[in-house]
Regions:
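Charged, terminal alpha-helix-loop-beta segments
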Residues: 2-19
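Donor-sugar nucleotide-binding helix/loop cap in glycosyltransferases
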Residues: 15-357
């Protein structure tokens, strides 16, 4: 990654070659593309979009980078690790453009388009901690081949696979990657960032594509999205002192309803245990801490120490990630009020109704 960082203007080169890369993609039937030397590795079909994927824009960075590598190598299949290094480098270069702009414009957290991009690293020496951060980012957003300890099943993790945009082939230590038909279609949409804008991350067409073709693949996430939109649509803006509690309840009810149905198969038990039951345990523990805080409310230092002991529940993490991504897609408008609390409204009622049906 350090060597890739030394190479500057890679983002600009992708911009210059984008038309040729797209023309290369148009000639390929990705449904037919396979790496005959290796075995295809599939996404494990986890029915939620992981909270680790805070935004969707890095997926666009991934497919565009992949297209450029295909054009350069004149091959629809490229090395997986090489792709991850290149995609991270492009994401970091974009962050170097976005973050200074956002600081200059004093963008609030709710307005930042750089969320989900890696924090640029400027030191000459790469520390062990930085290497870990870089690898974690690449694994989460661009993909990682994993082996289930219980079943020994090999799967593909990461945002790109969760959205159904890529296919990966692996055997022993050799791993390659290509696009799916869906990944090709998503790549071919024009993107504001790759057109030179730094105050937008996804076009309306790209957002529509993700809403209509990607999110529905993850049934629990799709149900949460529909129920959350319904709640925000019915809430009078400014009338709710803190919408977070209401949104948490909607997320919890959506997940519980899906877990109780017969639609999740083997994942119902895991979602019940790791999301719902775990959230109940943490909430119970947090309430005990709240009681202790009341007992020492005049001791500011002790109050701060106790607050640090409180944990975020899995349901809260799902709510935060879901709302951030919906704001990115333009489905909800995210506003942070004077009290520092998040408020949400629906900018396009027809769009919201079409999703929440």
């Amino acid at each position: 990654q350090h060597d890739a960082r030394k190479s500057e203007k890679d983002f600009e080169r992708i911009q210059e070659n984008m038309m040729d890369a797209n023309n290369f993609l148009r000639e390929i039937k990705f449904d037919d593309v396979i790496d005959e030397k290796l075995e295809q590795i599939h996404y494990d079909q986890w029915p939620l979009i992981s909270t680790f994927y805070s935004r969707f824009f890095p997926a666009k960075v991934g497919v565009v980078t992949l297209a450029e590598m295909m054009r350069d190598k004149k091959s629809p299949i490229v090395d997986f690790e090489e792709f991850k290094i290149k995609a991270y480098d492009i994401a970091e270069e974009i962050a170097r453009k976005m973050i200074p702009f956002e600081k200059e414009k004093e963008r609030k957290r709710s307005q930042k388009k750089s969320t989900g991009l890696p924090k640029p690293y400027d030191l000459e020496e790469v520390t062990g901690l930085q290497s870990i951060k870089e690898q974690r980012y690449k694994d989460r957003y661009f993909g990682r081949v994993t082996k289930n300890k219980e079943s020994n099943e090999i799967n593909l993790d990461g945002l790109l696979s969760a959205l159904g945009l890529v296919k990966v082939f692996s055997k022993n230590k050799d791993t390659t990657i290509t696009l799916t038909k869906k990944g090709k279609d998503f790549c071919l949409y024009e993107n504001p960032v790759f057109k030179g804008k730094v105050d937008e991350s996804l076009s309306e067409d790209e957002s529509d594509f993700i809403k209509n073709n990607c999110i529905p693949q993850r049934p629990v996430q799709y149900q949460i999205v529909k129920d959350v939109i319904r709640l925000v649509s019915e809430t009078k803006h400014g009338k709710t002192p803190d919408m977070a509690d209401d949104l948490d309840k909607v997320c919890r009810d959506s997940i519980q309803g899906m877990a109780d149905s017969n639609k999740l198969g083997e994942y119902a038990e895991k979602i019940q245990r790791d999301v719902l039951d775990k959230s109940k345990e943490i909430l119970k523990s947090n309430k005990v801490i709240d009681g202790k805080i009341l007992d020492v409310k005049d001791d500011e230092k002790e109050v701060r120490n106790l607050k640090k002991l409180k944990k975020q529940t899995p349901v809260e993490s799902i709510r935060i990630a879901t709302m951030g991504r919906l704001a990115e897609l333009g489905v909800v408008h995210w506003h942070i009020n004077d009290s520092g609390r998040s408020e949400y409204t629906i900018p396009d009622k027809k769009l919201a109704e079409s999703i929440s049906k």
